[in-house]
């Protein structure tokens, strides 16, 4: 699938399928003057289609017809009243799915002129590419139906750089989707390390992988406490992108990397969704996806991508409820629930990131069911002691169409994590569980410019939503890239 930005007007384009994006104002009591010209050329087909289909130009609403001549199909897609970048993305996705159903080989898409044509071009590329993504790796008879092979963005000549950047971001999202969607017998800690090695070789990134013995030397008792039950070796991954010039800032991104979570001795029971615990490395997947995108884009920012990767299993070597672990900053943790393991692995990863001398740290993790209860499946939670960093991430997420909601770091709640035998317990009371989880992580970060994203809900969708097919969404990659580039 190739994208090309051209100056051609819709009335002069020829090919399989032409899509026009229309606002509600453009089809008011009378068509806009621009649409009237097209309607005259097409012998009234446009007005007839709008009237007969009762098309109202609601966001992502579509209607189609044949118009004959040099164009086989016409798609009208609604943009709503005052379209945002996310609206353009969703409208483009709706067009892509229609064009695929028509088996169109060539597609042109024309949206109304804007004072930010680069944003529109990027939104079209992201919306179409992400909507048409298919993961057929594990099918014995893969579905070979694909979308158009050639897509032209009309009226957007000169936006080649925006198209290229959007394709680079999409490549990162697709990597994250593939990692999250694959089962735990395919994506293991070793697989994640191999993926990091491939990225390093492909993109010229620096790579450090700490094996268990090196992690032990560094005092990573919290991470290794989780890892010791698994027969698969843990991998502590540290990828670094360094620009050729002096970086304008240095950042660290830390992703939770549990390739499977059984719950340990606090095992997940029937109805717990244990079969979906392959997704518990969604934070690490987004981290590697962001590494791919950043490595392709090559901004003037130094970025460290970190993940402590392991499984949480059950064996004679496994940690017991009540065990006390010592993290690499010397803090001791009473494990009162082995199924709250992600925060243990993150503890040592955050201590590591904190020692890199970066300007800001962001971690993201499929950390708590409590966050899903609070915010639902589509919104990630955001905690940060830094108002500036929180606002940067909120704006980055808004531009990406990835929803974030800031929640409080309510310090008095930390009392619920106090242990009579260690510095902290790894879980507190049921109430405010996502907040106490964030407060737990805060004990392992001295840096004041830190944020925690709980992405437990949006990394996976059971049904198709806009440009996200059912399954892994790749959530977080586009927000992280926007943040790095901001």
UniProtKB/Swiss-Prot annotation:
Organism field: Synechococcus elongatus (strain ATCC 33912 / PCC 7942 / FACHB-805)
Catalyses which reaction(s): Release of an N-terminal amino acid, Xaa-|-Yaa-, in which Xaa is preferably Leu, but may be other amino acids including Pro although not Arg or Lys, and Yaa may be Pro. Amino acid amides and methyl esters are also readily hydrolyzed, but rates on arylamides are exceedingly low; Release of an N-terminal amino acid, preferentially leucine, but not glutamic or aspartic acids
UniProt xrefs under HAMAP family: Cytosol_peptidase_M17
Protein name: Probable cytosol aminopeptidase
Location in the cell: Cytoplasm
MF annotations from Gene Ontology: manganese ion binding; metalloaminopeptidase activity
UniProt cross-references to InterPro entries, sorted A to Z: Leucine_aapep/pepB (IPR011356), Macro_dom-like (IPR043472), Peptidase_M17_C (IPR000819), Peptidase_M17_leu_NH2_pept (IPR023042), Peptidase_M17_N (IPR008283)
Cofactor remark: Binds 2 manganese ions per subunit.
Predominant subcellular localization, coarse grouping: cytoplasm
Family listed: Belongs to the peptidase M17 family.
Purpose: Presumably involved in the processing and regular turnover of intracellular proteins. Catalyzes the removal of unsubstituted N-terminal amino acids from various peptides.
GO CC list: cytoplasm
TM spans (from-to): none
Keywords, in A-Z order: Aminopeptidase, Cytoplasm, Hydrolase, Manganese, Protease
UniProt cofactor(s): Mn(2+)
EC annotation from Swiss-Prot or TrEMBL: 3.4.11.1, 3.4.11.10
PROSITE patterns: CYTOSOL_AP
Protein's GO biological process: proteolysis
């Amino acid at each position: 699938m190739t994208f090309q930005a051209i100056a051609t007007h819709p009335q002069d384009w020829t090919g399989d399928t032409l899509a026009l994006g229309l606002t509600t104002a453009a089809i008011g009591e009378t068509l806009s003057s621009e649409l009237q010209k097209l309607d005259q050329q097409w012998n009234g087909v446009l007005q007839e289609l709008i009237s007969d289909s009762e098309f109202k130009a609601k966001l992502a609403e579509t209607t189609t017809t044949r118009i004959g001549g040099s164009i086989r199909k016409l798609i009208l897609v609604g943009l709503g009243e005052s379209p945002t970048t996310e609206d353009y993305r969703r409208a483009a996705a709706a067009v892509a799915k229609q064009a695929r159903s028509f088996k169109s080989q060539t597609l042109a898409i024309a949206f109304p002129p804007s004072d930010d044509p680069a944003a529109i071009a990027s939104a079209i590329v992201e919306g179409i590419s992400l909507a048409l993504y298919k993961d057929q790796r594990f099918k014995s008879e893969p579905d070979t139906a694909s979308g158009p092979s050639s897509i032209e963005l009309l009226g957007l000549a000169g936006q080649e750089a925006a198209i290229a950047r959007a394709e680079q971001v999409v490549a990162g999202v697709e990597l994250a989707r593939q990692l999250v969607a694959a089962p735990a017998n395919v994506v293991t800690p070793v697989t994640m390390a191999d993926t990091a090695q491939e990225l390093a070789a492909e993109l010229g990134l620096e790579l450090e992988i700490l094996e268990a013995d090196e992690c032990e030397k560094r005092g990573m008792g919290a991470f290794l406490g989780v890892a010791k039950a698994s027969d698969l070796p843990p991998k502590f991954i540290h990828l670094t992108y360094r620009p050729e010039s002096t970086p304008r800032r240095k950042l660290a991104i830390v992703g939770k990397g549990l390739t499977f979570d059984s719950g340990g001795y606090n095992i997940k029971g029937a109805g717990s969704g244990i079969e979906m615990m392959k997704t518990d490395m969604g934070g690490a997947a987004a981290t590697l996806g962001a590494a791919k995108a950043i490595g392709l884009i090559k901004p003037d920012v130094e970025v460290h991508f970190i993940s402590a990767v392991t499984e949480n299993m059950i064996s004679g070597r496994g940690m017991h409820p009540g065990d006390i672990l010592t993290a690499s900053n010397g803090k001791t943790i009473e494990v009162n629930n082995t199924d709250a393991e992600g925060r243990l692995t993150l503890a040592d990863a955050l201590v590591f990131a904190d020692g890199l001398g970066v300007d800001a740290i962001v971690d993201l993790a499929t950390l708590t069911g409590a966050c899903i209860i609070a915010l639902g499946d589509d919104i990630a939670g955001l905690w940060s002691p830094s108002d500036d960093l929180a606002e940067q991430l909120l704006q980055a997420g808004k531009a990406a169409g990835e929803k974030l909601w800031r929640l409080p770091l309510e310090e008095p709640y930390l009392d619920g994590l106090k242990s009579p035998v260690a510095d902290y317990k790894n879980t507190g009371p049921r109430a405010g569980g996502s907040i106490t989880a964030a407060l737990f992580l805060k004990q392992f970060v001295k840096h004041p410019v830190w944020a925690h994203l709980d992405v437990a809900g949006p990394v996976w969708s059971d049904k198709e939503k806009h440009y996200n097919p059912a399954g892994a969404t790749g959530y977080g990659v586009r927000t992280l890239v926007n943040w790095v580039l901001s």
